[in-house]
């Protein structure tokens, strides 16, 4: 992993994580629960996903059904570190509303329609299917309580390529089963991985005939057609101009089928994109493929660091952002700039620089203003959700936030002169 193009305070953090070994688990356990209850996901403030999982016949929660991670630790994990619980804890159930399945059910955890979470969180028990394909089992994903879940196209195609599509059921009501078999997670963020977990992605990728699709020397994954990115990221036009000038094919992955996305990953020598879910697609890559990820925040995507190790990727990180205000990695907003680190990469590789009209001071000021306005609107919404303020309180908070942001912008401009 090349960290030469990271800000100095970031480089040390990345290097420490890169040096940490990610253990490869050879044996994965299973837990069997007779007359177990499947609990669909119920919203909980202190969980990434919520409450849900499996209860035993006496309605005690089965810890093996939790979904866990160590994603919040941007440093090597120790035995004393507490696991994050993405899905966990039971809840009271009404026996009169419980459905019953007189079958053995394989528990797969929770699923939603976020592609990134599907790849690294929701797929971790699918390996069990590959090891028991000759057995006539049903495989159950939990979905949100009372939700009529319909998988998005890439997830649906993933199941088809794996061969499990016809075996799946989605649990949106409390359901009691003759037996529930709970495979252990095949991968836990920042804790361990397994060959079994990787076999799932190898099986899916090998089910696509990549020879039917074009091959590329260099591809840049753009997010400018991604709806969420339009509301959280500013300045990608700098990268679009830079990479198009230097021979990269510009591709918007959300406009491709899963087969096409897999073919792009496996048929391209050098892939590049902004850090995020795009990099997680490298789970479909061949070992030792080369990728460049441009950072939009100081927050480290720990799952991506794991993927780099699992697939032995030739990864280069470049810092090219201005973080004027704190923001969560999944929230934003993010301001992408033509940083000194990106310029160093461009010069060291004899690349053409972006056009002046996308990296000028005038453009930077305009992007900064848009960034401030976006930050203000997004965080005002967060205040409304968290504190449930009245309209009058929100107007006062809006004025305070606006004043502080404007003062910060004025001070920043004075310091730059």
Regions found by a protein language model. Name each.
Residues 1-414:
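The feature primarily captures lumenal catalytic ectodomains
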């Amino acid at each position: 992993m090349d960290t030469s193009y990271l800000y100095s305070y970031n480089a040390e953090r990345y290097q420490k994580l890169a040096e940490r070994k990610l253990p490869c688990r050879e044996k994965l356990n299973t837990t069997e629960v007779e007359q177990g209850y499947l609990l669909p996901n119920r919203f909980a403030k202190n969980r990434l996903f919520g409450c849900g999982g499996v209860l035993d016949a006496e309605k005690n929660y089965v810890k093996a059904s939790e979904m866990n991670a160590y994603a919040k630790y941007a440093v090597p994990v120790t035995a004393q570190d507490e696991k994050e619980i993405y899905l966990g804890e039971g809840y009271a159930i009404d026996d009169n509303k419980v459905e019953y399945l007189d079958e053995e059910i394989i528990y797969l955890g929770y699923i939603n329609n976020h592609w990134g979470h599907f790849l690294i969180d929701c797929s971790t028990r699918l390996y069990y299917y590959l090891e028991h394909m000759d057995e006539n089992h049903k495989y159950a994903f939990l979905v949100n309580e009372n939700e009529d879940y319909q998988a998005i196209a890439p997830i649906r195609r993933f199941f088809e390529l794996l061969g499990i599509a016809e075996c799946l059921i989605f649990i949106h009501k409390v359901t009691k089963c003759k037996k529930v078999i709970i495979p252990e997670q095949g991968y836990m963020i920042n804790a361990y991985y397994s060959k079994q977990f990787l076999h799932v992605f190898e099986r899916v990728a090998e089910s696509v005939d990549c020879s039917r699709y074009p091959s590329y020397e260099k591809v840049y994954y753009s997010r400018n057609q991604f709806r969420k990115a339009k509301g959280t990221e500013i300045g990608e036009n700098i990268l679009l101009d830079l990479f198009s000038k230097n021979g990269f094919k510009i591709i918007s992955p959300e406009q491709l089928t899963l087969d096409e996305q897999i073919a792009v990953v496996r048929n391209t020598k050098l892939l590049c994109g902004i850090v995020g879910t795009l990099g997680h697609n490298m789970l479909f890559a061949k070992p030792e493929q080369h990728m460049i990820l441009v950072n939009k925040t100081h927050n480290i995507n720990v799952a991506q660091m794991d993927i780099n190790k699992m697939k032995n990727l030739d990864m280069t990180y470049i810092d090219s952002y201005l973080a004027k205000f704190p923001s969560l990695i999944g929230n934003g907003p993010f301001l992408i700039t033509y940083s000194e680190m990106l310029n160093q990469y461009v010069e060291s590789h004899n690349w053409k620089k972006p056009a002046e009209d996308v990296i000028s001071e005038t453009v930077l000021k305009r992007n900064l203003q848009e960034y401030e306005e976006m930050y203000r609107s997004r965080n005002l919404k967060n205040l409304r959700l968290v504190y449930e303020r009245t309209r009058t309180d929100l107007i006062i908070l809006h004025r305070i936030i606006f004043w502080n942001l404007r003062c910060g912008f004025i001070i920043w401009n004075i310091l730059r002169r």
